[in-house]
Structures are given as C-alpha cells and as structure tokens.
C-alpha cells in the first residue's frame, strides 16, 4: 500500500495521528512478490464497468477484504494468502482505484458496498461473509453488515475510521490550542492539487506533487510491483477516485455509517487499534497519548455494538497494522471465523502476543 504524505484525512483532524511503523525498518528481502499485483486479477462486470476482484482459496464463510483510502488489493498481501489456506478470500480495488474502472458516482461507503456486493454476486462468491476493513474500509464494512445483515457473520476492523472522528478531532484540537497556543498557528502542508497535477494523464515523476499525491510504498514490496503500483496511483483515474473518497469521507460516508444499526447482536466484531506511538516533534507525549485514547474510545464504541465485540490494542504498530503486524490481523480473522462457526464462544479481551 502507499502512504500519502499529504492526506485529506490528516488535514481535517484524523485522530489516528501515528507514524507507520513500517517506515522504521525494511525487511532483508521482499515479502510481497506475487505477480498478481502487476495487473488485474479478474475484471468483473457490474453493469457497464468492471471491478478488479482478487479471489483465492476455498471454504466458507468467505472472507472479504476492503482496503483503506486510496489503497488496493495489495493492502492485504501479507494477510490474504494465510486466510486463503482454509477459506475463500476476496480483495478488490474500489471504483477508479488500482485496476478497476472509474465510476460516475461519488466515492462513498454506500456506493462502494453496492459495487462489491454486485461483484460478489456476479463472481458467484456466495455468503456467508466475514468482512475485514482497514482504515476507511472499516466504515464501509459496517455499512455492508448493516445492509446485508443476513449475509454477514462477523467483522474485523483494522484501525478503522469512524464517522465521528472529525467532530471529535475538532473538539480535541480546540482544547489542545488552549493548552498549547502554538498549535493553533502550526503550519499545514499545502494542498498539492493532485487531480490538477495529473491532468496530462498521470502525475509526472519530477512533479513536486508526485510524492505527496502518490505516497510511499511499504519497503517489503518487490520493486517491479512497487513501480507498477506507483504508475497506477499516479494516473488521473486514481487521483480523481481518491479525491472523491476524500471529499465524501467526513460528510456523505460518515452520515451513511452513522445511519447504520448500533446493535449487531452476538456477531463477532474484533477491532484492532494501534498502540500509542512516540509524539511528533513539537507535541508533548501526554498530548499524543490523549489523542490515541480518543481513537481507542471510538473503536471501543464499535466493539460495544456486539456482545462478542472486543478491541485489541496492537503494540509495535502504526496505522498500517496489516503491514506492521499481519500476524495479529490473521489471528483476529481466524478467531472471528471460529466464533462465527461455533468453534469458539467469546473473543479474547486482549491479544497474548506482545
């Protein structure tokens, strides 16, 4: 996956405010080498446009992966293969991202859910489904589970976005500015105008907007896959899709998620939340820890929507837990599957592995 240096979610006060742990060290050899990420896995026609759907494995329930904002199937490269040993698994590129065709509809959680549900039907991937969502994908899987409650047996939400994170961030920022007035005058990175920068068809590599708009790749990805991913991300199609997702995140998508049910009965819901990280320069550690606690509380609220809900705090991780600690994500999925199929009764309160 890529990490954009200038992201709209950060600009509007995203509470996760944590460096990605994968930037700290690179593996000795590439961990992501599957050539499936060099092109479309399967282009599924969902009514005049195609969605890139990558399915592998056998076994029910099927596990459906939804990546974070501006991300694609590669977000699950360290998780999906392990789960596919025992279950059917599918990841996909949302409309306009990766190898999926662009849509003339806005990039909202409900529209994304409509797309992937149609694709699963066309591809004959039958329910029941266990849904796994990272970041903004965490809101989408909740919309899916609400809309198709009879088809969903569980959710694993990996450092998921929350419909109220922006409003809570604004309240937090007001308190922080009163405590530390310099924060009210901190520099905000300039908008790189990504869509404009890609108007020729793609953002040129020598453009000042290239790195802010395209981002950085997890260092464990094979170079050929990295190059292809960057080329796809730099394309005008991808930049328009990401801009649409950003524009709708705190408004339409948040409202769609807010309108979903607050009681999922005994459906397993396992939330994964990054542990506190060192504070960025100029921010007291106590303030950074409070930010993380607000993020944790948002996740606790989602876990409380089920009698089988739990929030695991994941040490040694940033926002990209799917790369930083893929083994934890795999354990959470396997536990949710075990509960959903009656092989386990309750989720563990915490994860045993440090």
Language model regions located:
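N-terminal cap/lid segment of alpha/beta-hydrolase-fold proteins
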Residues: 30-50
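Conserved hydrolase catalytic core segment
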Residues: 127-170
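Alpha/beta-hydrolase
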Residues: 171-301
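Conserved HGGG/HGGXW glycine-rich cap/lid loop of the alpha/beta-hydrolase fold
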Residues: 46-99
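Bacterial N-terminal signal peptides
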Residues: 10-18
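Bacterial N-terminal signal peptides that target proteins for export
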Residues: 1-9
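Catalytic active-site module of serine/aspartate enzymes centered on a nucleophile-bearing elbow/loop
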Residues: 307-354
């Amino acid at each position: 996956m890529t990490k954009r240096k200038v992201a709209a979610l950060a600009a509007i006060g995203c509470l996760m405010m944590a460096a990605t742990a994968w930037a700290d060290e690179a593996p000795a050899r590439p961990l992501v080498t599957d050539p499936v990420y060099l092109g479309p896995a399967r282009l599924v026609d969902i009514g005049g446009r195609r969605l890139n759907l990558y399915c592998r494995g056998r076994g029910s329930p099927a596990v459906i992966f939804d990546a974070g904002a501006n991300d694609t199937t590669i977000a699950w490269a360290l998780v999906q293969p392990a789960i596919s040993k025992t279950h059917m698994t599918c990841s996909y590129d949302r409309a306009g991202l990766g190898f999926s065709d662009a849509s003339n509809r806005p990039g909202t959680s409900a529209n994304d859910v409509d797309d992937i549900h149609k694709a699963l039907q066309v591809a004959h991937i039958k329910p029941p489904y266990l849904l796994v969502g990272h970041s903004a994908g965490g809101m989408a899987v909740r919309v899916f589970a609400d809309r198709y409650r009879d088809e969903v047996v569980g959710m694993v939400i990996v450092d998921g976005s929350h419909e109220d994170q922006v409003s809570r961030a604004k309240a937090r920022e007001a308190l922080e500015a009163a405590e530390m007035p310099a924060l009210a005058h901190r520099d905000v990175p300039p908008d790189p105008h990504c869509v404009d920068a890609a108007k020729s068809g793609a953002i040129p590599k020598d453009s000042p907007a290239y790195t802010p708009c395209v981002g950085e790749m997890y260092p464990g990805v094979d170079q050929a896959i990295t190059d292809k991913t960057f080329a796809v991300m730099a394309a005008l199609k991808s930049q328009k899709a990401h801009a649409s997702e950003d524009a709708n995140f705190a408004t339409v998508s948040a409202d769609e998620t807010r309108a979903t049910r607050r009681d999922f009965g005994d459906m397993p819901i396992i939330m994964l939340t990054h542990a506190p990280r060192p504070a960025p320069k100029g921010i007291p550690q106590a303030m950074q820890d409070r930010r993380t606690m607000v993020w944790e509380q948002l996740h606790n609220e989602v876990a409380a929507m089920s009698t089988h809900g739990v929030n695991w705090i994941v040490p040694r991780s940033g926002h990209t837990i799917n790369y930083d600690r893929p083994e934890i994500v795999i354990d959470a999925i396997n536990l949710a599957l075990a509960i959903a199929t009656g092989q386990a009764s309750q989720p563990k309160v915490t994860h045993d592995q440090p």
